[in-house]
Protein backbone atom coordinates (compact mmCIF):
# COMPACT_ATOMS: atom_id res chain seq x y z
CA UNK A 1 0.00 0.00 0.00
CA UNK A 2 1.42 3.37 -1.03
CA UNK A 3 1.94 5.85 1.80
CA UNK A 4 1.54 8.73 -0.70
CA UNK A 5 -0.23 9.25 -4.01
CA UNK A 6 1.22 7.35 -6.99
CA UNK A 7 3.35 9.39 -9.38
CA UNK A 8 2.92 7.17 -12.43
CA UNK A 9 -0.71 6.33 -13.21
CA UNK A 10 -0.31 5.03 -16.76
CA UNK A 11 2.32 3.19 -18.80
CA UNK A 12 1.70 5.77 -21.54
CA UNK A 13 3.25 8.40 -19.24
CA UNK A 14 6.60 8.09 -21.02
CA UNK A 15 8.30 9.31 -24.17
CA UNK A 16 7.21 8.13 -27.61
CA UNK A 17 10.69 6.96 -28.54
CA UNK A 18 10.50 4.29 -25.84
CA UNK A 19 7.76 2.63 -27.88
CA UNK A 20 9.42 3.16 -31.26
CA UNK A 21 12.71 1.71 -29.98
CA UNK A 22 11.02 -1.12 -28.07
CA UNK A 23 9.20 -2.20 -31.23
CA UNK A 24 12.51 -2.55 -33.11
CA UNK A 25 14.10 -4.44 -30.20
CA UNK A 26 11.13 -6.81 -30.04
CA UNK A 27 11.21 -7.46 -33.79
CA UNK A 28 14.96 -7.49 -34.45
CA UNK A 29 16.86 -8.56 -31.28
CA UNK A 30 14.33 -9.60 -28.59
CA UNK A 31 16.77 -11.77 -26.60
CA UNK A 32 19.14 -8.89 -25.82
CA UNK A 33 20.07 -8.50 -22.15
CA UNK A 34 20.82 -5.00 -20.84
CA UNK A 35 22.03 -3.07 -17.79
CA UNK A 36 21.10 0.55 -16.99
CA UNK A 37 22.64 2.70 -14.26
CA UNK A 38 21.38 5.89 -12.59
CA UNK A 39 23.54 8.98 -12.17
CA UNK A 40 22.90 12.48 -10.82
CA UNK A 41 25.30 14.89 -12.51
CA UNK A 42 24.76 17.76 -10.06
CA UNK A 43 24.72 16.14 -6.61
CA UNK A 44 26.54 19.13 -5.13
CA UNK A 45 23.56 21.35 -6.03
CA UNK A 46 20.78 19.34 -4.38
CA UNK A 47 18.94 20.89 -1.42
CA UNK A 48 19.04 17.61 0.49
CA UNK A 49 20.54 14.13 -0.15
CA UNK A 50 18.70 12.11 -2.79
CA UNK A 51 19.03 9.10 -0.52
CA UNK A 52 16.32 10.66 1.67
CA UNK A 53 13.71 9.64 -0.93
CA UNK A 54 14.85 5.99 -1.09
CA UNK A 55 11.96 4.43 0.87
CA UNK A 56 9.36 6.42 -1.06
CA UNK A 57 11.11 5.55 -4.32
CA UNK A 58 10.92 1.84 -3.61
CA UNK A 59 7.20 2.18 -2.81
CA UNK A 60 6.63 4.00 -6.09
CA UNK A 61 8.56 1.32 -7.99
CA UNK A 62 6.37 -1.35 -6.38
CA UNK A 63 3.32 0.52 -7.66
CA UNK A 64 4.82 1.09 -11.12
CA UNK A 65 5.25 -2.65 -11.52
CA UNK A 66 1.52 -3.25 -10.98
CA UNK A 67 0.48 -1.16 -13.99
CA UNK A 68 -0.76 -2.58 -17.30
CA UNK A 69 -1.91 -0.91 -20.49
CA UNK A 70 -5.63 -0.10 -20.64
CA UNK A 71 -7.77 -0.88 -23.69
CA UNK A 72 -8.14 2.77 -24.73
CA UNK A 73 -4.36 3.24 -24.46
CA UNK A 74 -3.72 0.27 -26.71
CA UNK A 75 -6.26 1.58 -29.22
CA UNK A 76 -4.50 4.93 -29.19
CA UNK A 77 -1.14 3.30 -29.98
CA UNK A 78 -2.77 1.20 -32.68
CA UNK A 79 -3.85 4.41 -34.45
CA UNK A 80 -0.27 5.23 -35.51
CA UNK A 81 0.75 3.76 -38.84
CA UNK A 82 4.30 3.02 -37.63
CA UNK A 83 3.05 0.88 -34.71
CA UNK A 84 2.54 -2.73 -35.81
CA UNK A 85 -0.42 -4.77 -34.61
CA UNK A 86 1.75 -7.56 -33.17
CA UNK A 87 3.58 -4.96 -31.07
CA UNK A 88 0.30 -3.75 -29.58
CA UNK A 89 -0.57 -7.39 -28.86
CA UNK A 90 2.73 -7.65 -26.95
CA UNK A 91 1.97 -4.47 -25.00
CA UNK A 92 -1.43 -5.87 -24.01
CA UNK A 93 0.47 -8.51 -22.02
CA UNK A 94 3.19 -6.11 -20.84
CA UNK A 95 3.96 -5.49 -17.18
CA UNK A 96 7.23 -4.24 -15.69
CA UNK A 97 8.85 -6.82 -13.42
CA UNK A 98 10.03 -5.56 -10.02
CA UNK A 99 12.92 -8.02 -9.88
CA UNK A 100 14.69 -6.22 -12.74
CA UNK A 101 15.18 -2.95 -10.81
CA UNK A 102 16.96 -2.26 -7.51
CA UNK A 103 17.28 1.03 -5.66
CA UNK A 104 19.66 1.46 -2.74
CA UNK A 105 22.67 3.42 -1.50
CA UNK A 106 26.16 2.91 -2.94
CA UNK A 107 29.49 2.80 -1.07
CA UNK A 108 29.86 6.57 -1.34
CA UNK A 109 26.43 7.20 0.19
CA UNK A 110 24.71 8.15 -3.07
CA UNK A 111 21.34 7.03 -4.41
CA UNK A 112 22.07 3.97 -6.53
CA UNK A 113 19.62 2.55 -9.07
CA UNK A 114 20.31 -0.39 -11.37
CA UNK A 115 18.07 -1.96 -13.98
CA UNK A 116 19.19 -5.34 -15.27
CA UNK A 117 17.18 -7.70 -17.43
CA UNK A 118 15.87 -8.37 -20.94
CA UNK A 119 16.05 -5.16 -22.96
CA UNK A 120 12.37 -5.53 -23.90
CA UNK A 121 11.67 -4.96 -20.20
CA UNK A 122 14.61 -2.92 -18.96
CA UNK A 123 14.47 -0.08 -21.47
CA UNK A 124 10.96 0.89 -20.38
CA UNK A 125 12.01 1.78 -16.81
CA UNK A 126 14.07 4.86 -17.66
CA UNK A 127 11.55 7.68 -18.08
CA UNK A 128 9.30 6.41 -15.28
CA UNK A 129 12.21 6.20 -12.82
CA UNK A 130 13.55 9.67 -13.66
CA UNK A 131 10.08 11.22 -13.38
CA UNK A 132 9.53 9.49 -10.03
CA UNK A 133 12.89 10.62 -8.60
CA UNK A 134 12.23 14.18 -9.73
CA UNK A 135 8.74 14.40 -8.32
CA UNK A 136 9.68 12.80 -4.99
CA UNK A 137 12.59 15.22 -4.64
CA UNK A 138 10.58 18.34 -5.42
CA UNK A 139 7.53 17.31 -3.36
CA UNK A 140 9.61 17.86 -0.22
CA UNK A 141 10.54 21.43 -1.12
CA UNK A 142 7.26 22.46 -2.74
CA UNK A 143 5.56 25.66 -1.64
CA UNK A 144 3.00 28.15 -2.92
CA UNK A 145 5.85 30.56 -3.62
CA UNK A 146 7.55 28.01 -5.90
CA UNK A 147 4.34 27.41 -7.87
CA UNK A 148 3.75 31.16 -8.17
CA UNK A 149 7.28 31.63 -9.52
CA UNK A 150 6.75 28.78 -11.97
CA UNK A 151 3.54 30.42 -13.21
CA UNK A 152 5.28 33.79 -13.55
CA UNK A 153 8.00 32.19 -15.66
CA UNK A 154 5.43 30.36 -17.77
CA UNK A 155 3.60 33.60 -18.52
CA UNK A 156 6.93 35.20 -19.48
CA UNK A 157 7.53 32.37 -21.95
CA UNK A 158 4.08 32.87 -23.47
CA UNK A 159 4.77 36.60 -23.82
CA UNK A 160 8.07 35.81 -25.53
CA UNK A 161 6.34 33.47 -27.98
CA UNK A 162 3.84 36.22 -28.76
CA UNK A 163 6.78 38.46 -29.62
CA UNK A 164 8.41 35.79 -31.82
CA UNK A 165 5.11 35.10 -33.57
CA UNK A 166 4.83 38.79 -34.43
CA UNK A 167 8.40 38.88 -35.79
CA UNK A 168 8.00 35.73 -37.88
CA UNK A 169 7.52 36.28 -41.61
CA UNK A 170 4.83 34.21 -43.35
CA UNK A 171 7.20 33.11 -46.12
CA UNK A 172 9.78 31.74 -43.64
CA UNK A 173 9.96 28.14 -42.38
CA UNK A 174 7.83 27.83 -39.23
CA UNK A 175 9.29 28.19 -35.73
CA UNK A 176 8.40 24.81 -34.18
CA UNK A 177 8.73 23.95 -30.48
CA UNK A 178 7.98 20.63 -28.77
CA UNK A 179 7.97 19.50 -25.14
CA UNK A 180 10.76 17.01 -24.38
CA UNK A 181 10.57 17.43 -20.60
CA UNK A 182 8.99 14.29 -19.11
CA UNK A 183 12.22 12.92 -17.61
CA UNK A 184 13.07 16.12 -15.72
CA UNK A 185 9.62 17.51 -14.96
CA UNK A 186 8.56 19.16 -11.71
CA UNK A 187 5.44 16.99 -11.65
CA UNK A 188 2.97 15.40 -14.05
CA UNK A 189 0.36 18.05 -13.26
CA UNK A 190 2.80 20.87 -13.94
CA UNK A 191 3.93 19.37 -17.24
CA UNK A 192 0.30 19.05 -18.32
CA UNK A 193 -0.41 22.65 -17.29
CA UNK A 194 2.54 24.00 -19.30
CA UNK A 195 1.78 21.93 -22.40
CA UNK A 196 -1.90 22.88 -22.34
CA UNK A 197 -0.98 26.57 -22.14
CA UNK A 198 1.46 26.37 -25.05
CA UNK A 199 -0.97 24.38 -27.17
CA UNK A 200 -3.90 26.70 -26.42
CA UNK A 201 -2.08 29.97 -27.10
CA UNK A 202 0.30 28.95 -29.90
CA UNK A 203 -1.03 25.98 -31.88
CA UNK A 204 1.05 27.00 -34.92
CA UNK A 205 4.31 27.06 -32.93
CA UNK A 206 3.78 24.27 -30.42
CA UNK A 207 4.36 21.10 -32.42
CA UNK A 208 3.63 18.49 -29.76
CA UNK A 209 5.07 16.56 -26.82
CA UNK A 210 7.27 13.52 -26.37
CA UNK A 211 4.85 12.36 -23.62
CA UNK A 212 2.42 9.86 -25.10
CA UNK A 213 -0.19 10.10 -22.32
CA UNK A 214 -0.35 13.89 -22.52
CA UNK A 215 -0.50 13.76 -26.31
CA UNK A 216 -3.51 11.44 -25.97
CA UNK A 217 -5.25 13.48 -23.26
CA UNK A 218 -4.70 16.88 -24.93
CA UNK A 219 -5.18 15.62 -28.50
CA UNK A 220 -1.78 16.84 -29.71
CA UNK A 221 1.00 15.16 -31.68
CA UNK A 222 3.40 12.79 -29.90
CA UNK A 223 7.00 13.48 -30.97
CA UNK A 224 10.07 11.24 -31.03
CA UNK A 225 12.15 8.71 -32.94
CA UNK A 226 15.25 7.21 -31.29
CA UNK A 227 17.52 7.74 -28.28
CA UNK A 228 21.20 6.98 -27.66
CA UNK A 229 20.48 3.57 -26.14
CA UNK A 230 19.16 2.23 -29.47
CA UNK A 231 22.40 2.99 -31.30
CA UNK A 232 24.57 2.03 -28.33
CA UNK A 233 23.02 -1.44 -28.17
CA UNK A 234 24.54 -2.19 -31.57
CA UNK A 235 28.01 -1.80 -30.04
CA UNK A 236 27.32 -5.16 -28.40
CA UNK A 237 25.31 -6.93 -31.11
CA UNK A 238 26.68 -9.14 -33.88
CA UNK A 239 28.33 -6.42 -35.98
CA UNK A 240 31.87 -5.03 -36.10
CA UNK A 241 32.21 -2.17 -33.64
CA UNK A 242 33.24 0.14 -36.47
CA UNK A 243 29.92 -0.64 -38.21
CA UNK A 244 27.54 -0.27 -35.25
CA UNK A 245 26.03 3.07 -36.33
CA UNK A 246 25.40 1.90 -39.88
CA UNK A 247 23.84 -1.32 -38.57
CA UNK A 248 21.57 0.61 -36.21
CA UNK A 249 20.43 3.06 -38.90
CA UNK A 250 19.86 0.23 -41.39
CA UNK A 251 17.79 -1.72 -38.85
CA UNK A 252 15.71 1.41 -38.19
CA UNK A 253 15.11 1.92 -41.91
CA UNK A 254 14.04 -1.70 -42.39
CA UNK A 255 11.57 -1.43 -39.49
CA UNK A 256 10.00 1.92 -40.32
CA UNK A 257 10.33 2.17 -44.11
CA UNK A 258 10.47 5.98 -44.18
CA UNK A 259 8.55 6.84 -41.01
CA UNK A 260 10.30 8.33 -37.95
CA UNK A 261 13.17 9.67 -40.01
CA UNK A 262 15.20 11.81 -37.59
CA UNK A 263 18.62 10.30 -36.78
CA UNK A 264 20.55 11.00 -33.57
CA UNK A 265 24.15 12.01 -34.25
CA UNK A 266 26.17 12.11 -31.03
CA UNK A 267 26.68 8.55 -29.79
CA UNK A 268 30.31 8.77 -30.91
CA UNK A 269 30.26 12.41 -31.95
CA UNK A 270 29.12 14.27 -35.07
CA UNK A 271 32.31 13.78 -37.09
CA UNK A 272 32.25 10.00 -36.69
CA UNK A 273 28.52 9.98 -37.39
CA UNK A 274 28.89 11.84 -40.68
CA UNK A 275 31.54 9.37 -41.84
CA UNK A 276 28.82 6.70 -41.60
CA UNK A 277 25.93 8.87 -42.83
CA UNK A 278 26.45 8.26 -46.55
CA UNK A 279 24.26 9.21 -49.52
CA UNK A 280 21.94 6.26 -48.88
CA UNK A 281 21.14 7.27 -45.30
CA UNK A 282 21.20 11.00 -46.08
CA UNK A 283 18.44 10.48 -48.65
CA UNK A 284 16.43 8.04 -46.53
CA UNK A 285 16.38 10.01 -43.27
CA UNK A 286 14.35 13.22 -43.03
CA UNK A 287 16.96 14.91 -40.87
CA UNK A 288 19.17 14.90 -37.81
CA UNK A 289 18.88 15.58 -34.06
CA UNK A 290 21.41 17.60 -32.09
CA UNK A 291 21.85 16.65 -28.42
CA UNK A 292 25.36 17.80 -27.47
CA UNK A 293 28.16 20.14 -28.50
CA UNK A 294 28.02 23.55 -30.17
CA UNK A 295 24.69 23.59 -32.09
CA UNK A 296 25.87 26.16 -34.65
CA UNK A 297 29.04 24.24 -35.46
CA UNK A 298 27.02 21.02 -35.61
CA UNK A 299 24.43 22.48 -37.99
CA UNK A 300 27.11 23.94 -40.23
CA UNK A 301 28.74 20.50 -40.42
CA UNK A 302 25.38 18.97 -41.36
CA UNK A 303 24.91 21.63 -44.04
CA UNK A 304 28.37 21.01 -45.54
CA UNK A 305 27.76 17.24 -45.52
CA UNK A 306 24.42 17.47 -47.32
CA UNK A 307 25.89 19.93 -49.83
CA UNK A 308 28.79 17.57 -50.53
CA UNK A 309 26.19 14.86 -51.25
CA UNK A 310 24.29 17.31 -53.50
CA UNK A 311 21.15 17.13 -51.35
CA UNK A 312 18.90 20.19 -51.03
CA UNK A 313 19.11 21.04 -47.33
CA UNK A 314 15.76 22.86 -47.42
CA UNK A 315 14.14 19.43 -47.69
CA UNK A 316 15.83 18.28 -44.46
CA UNK A 317 14.97 18.89 -40.80
CA UNK A 318 17.38 19.76 -38.01
CA UNK A 319 15.95 19.07 -34.55
CA UNK A 320 17.74 20.64 -31.58
CA UNK A 321 17.21 19.22 -28.08
CA UNK A 322 20.25 20.04 -25.94
CA UNK A 323 19.66 22.31 -22.94
CA UNK A 324 17.43 24.71 -24.82
CA UNK A 325 15.22 27.58 -23.78
CA UNK A 326 13.01 29.68 -26.07
CA UNK A 327 15.66 32.36 -26.58
CA UNK A 328 18.31 29.86 -27.68
CA UNK A 329 15.79 28.12 -29.93
CA UNK A 330 14.77 31.38 -31.62
CA UNK A 331 18.42 32.34 -32.23
CA UNK A 332 19.11 28.94 -33.79
CA UNK A 333 15.98 29.27 -35.91
CA UNK A 334 17.14 32.65 -37.18
CA UNK A 335 20.56 31.24 -38.05
CA UNK A 336 19.40 28.11 -39.90
CA UNK A 337 15.96 29.05 -41.29
CA UNK A 338 17.31 29.89 -44.76
CA UNK A 339 19.02 26.52 -45.12
CA UNK A 340 16.96 23.91 -43.26
CA UNK A 341 13.60 23.16 -41.77
CA UNK A 342 14.24 23.40 -38.03
CA UNK A 343 12.45 22.28 -34.87
CA UNK A 344 13.24 22.41 -31.17
CA UNK A 345 12.66 20.00 -28.30
CA UNK A 346 12.77 21.85 -24.99
CA UNK A 347 12.92 19.80 -21.80
CA UNK A 348 13.80 21.04 -18.33
CA UNK A 349 13.29 24.71 -19.18
CA UNK A 350 9.65 24.01 -20.07
CA UNK A 351 8.65 21.48 -17.43
CA UNK A 352 10.82 22.40 -14.43
CA UNK A 353 11.57 26.13 -14.54
CA UNK A 354 10.39 26.98 -11.03
CA UNK A 355 13.28 29.00 -9.64
CA UNK A 356 14.78 25.93 -7.97
CA UNK A 357 17.85 24.10 -9.31
CA UNK A 358 16.61 21.14 -11.39
CA UNK A 359 18.14 17.70 -10.94
CA UNK A 360 20.44 16.66 -13.77
CA UNK A 361 19.70 12.94 -13.65
CA UNK A 362 20.07 10.11 -16.15
CA UNK A 363 19.45 6.36 -16.27
CA UNK A 364 21.72 5.20 -19.05
CA UNK A 365 22.46 1.94 -20.83
CA UNK A 366 25.93 0.78 -19.72
CA UNK A 367 25.99 -2.88 -20.76
CA UNK A 368 24.40 -5.06 -23.40
CA UNK A 369 24.71 -8.87 -23.66
CA UNK A 370 27.47 -8.79 -21.05
CA UNK A 371 29.54 -6.25 -22.99
CA UNK A 372 30.11 -2.61 -22.11
CA UNK A 373 28.61 0.12 -24.27
CA UNK A 374 29.40 3.82 -24.20
CA UNK A 375 28.40 7.24 -25.46
CA UNK A 376 31.12 9.69 -26.48
CA UNK A 377 29.21 12.93 -26.41
CA UNK A 378 30.03 16.14 -28.29
CA UNK A 379 29.79 17.85 -24.86
CA UNK A 380 32.45 17.24 -22.18
CA UNK A 381 30.84 15.63 -19.14
CA UNK A 382 27.98 13.90 -21.01
CA UNK A 383 30.13 10.92 -22.00
CA UNK A 384 28.90 7.88 -20.08
CA UNK A 385 30.21 4.36 -19.54
CA UNK A 386 31.12 2.06 -16.66
CA UNK A 387 34.21 0.77 -18.51
CA UNK A 388 37.07 3.15 -19.27
CA UNK A 389 38.97 0.45 -21.19
CA UNK A 390 36.09 0.01 -23.62
CA UNK A 391 35.71 3.78 -23.87
CA UNK A 392 39.36 4.10 -24.89
CA UNK A 393 38.92 1.34 -27.49
CA UNK A 394 35.81 3.04 -28.88
CA UNK A 395 37.74 6.31 -29.18
CA UNK A 396 40.50 4.50 -31.04
CA UNK A 397 38.13 2.76 -33.47
CA UNK A 398 36.35 6.02 -34.34
CA UNK A 399 39.47 8.23 -34.18
CA UNK A 400 38.11 10.44 -31.41
CA UNK A 401 40.48 12.51 -29.26
CA UNK A 402 40.46 12.21 -25.47
CA UNK A 403 38.33 14.91 -23.86
CA UNK A 404 39.59 17.14 -21.09
CA UNK A 405 38.63 15.78 -17.64
CA UNK A 406 35.51 17.33 -16.13
CA UNK A 407 35.49 18.05 -12.43
Swiss-Prot record:
Consequence of gene loss (knockout): The nadB-pncB double mutant loses the ability to grow on minimal medium supplemented by 0.1 mm nicotinate, but it can grow normally in the presence of 0.1 mm nicotinamide.
One GO MF term attached to the UniProt entry: nicotinate phosphoribosyltransferase activity
EC number: 6.3.4.21
InterPro entries on file: N/Namide_PRibTrfase, NAPRTase_N, Nic_PRibTrfase, Nic_PRibTrfase-Fam, Nicotinate_pribotase-like_C
Any single GO CC term annotated in Swiss-Prot or TrEMBL for this entry: cytosol
Activity control, per UniProt: 100-fold more active in the presence of saturating ATP.
Entry keyword Phosphoprotein: yes
GO BP: NAD biosynthetic process via the salvage pathway
Metabolic or biological pathway, per its Swiss-Prot or TrEMBL entry: Cofactor biosynthesis; NAD(+) biosynthesis; nicotinate D-ribonucleotide from nicotinate: step 1/1
Modification sites for Phosphohistidine: 228
Keyword Phosphoprotein belongs to the record: yes
Pfam families attached to this UniProt entry: NAPRTase, NAPRTase_N
Domain of life: Bacteria
Post-translational modification: Transiently phosphorylated on a His residue during the reaction cycle. Phosphorylation strongly increases the affinity for substrates and increases the rate of nicotinate D-ribonucleotide production. Dephosphorylation regenerates the low-affinity form of the enzyme, leading to product release.
Annotated Gene3D superfamilies: nicotinate phosphoribosyltransferase
Catalytic activity: nicotinate + 5-phospho-alpha-D-ribose 1-diphosphate + ATP + H2O = nicotinate beta-D-ribonucleotide + ADP + phosphate + diphosphate
Alphabetized UniProt keyword annotations: Ligase, Phosphoprotein, Pyridine nucleotide biosynthesis
Its biological purpose: Catalyzes the synthesis of beta-nicotinate D-ribonucleotide from nicotinate and 5-phospho-D-ribose 1-phosphate at the expense of ATP. Functions in the deamidating salvage pathway for production of NAD from nicotinamide. Displays a strict preference for nicotinate over nicotinamide substrate.
Family assignment from sequence similarity: Belongs to the NAPRTase family.
PANTHER family: NICOTINATE PHOSPHORIBOSYLTRANSFERASE
Name of this protein: Nicotinate phosphoribosyltransferase
Source species: Acinetobacter baylyi (strain ATCC 33305 / BD413 / ADP1)
Record lineage: Bacteria, Pseudomonadati, Pseudomonadota, Gammaproteobacteria, Moraxellales
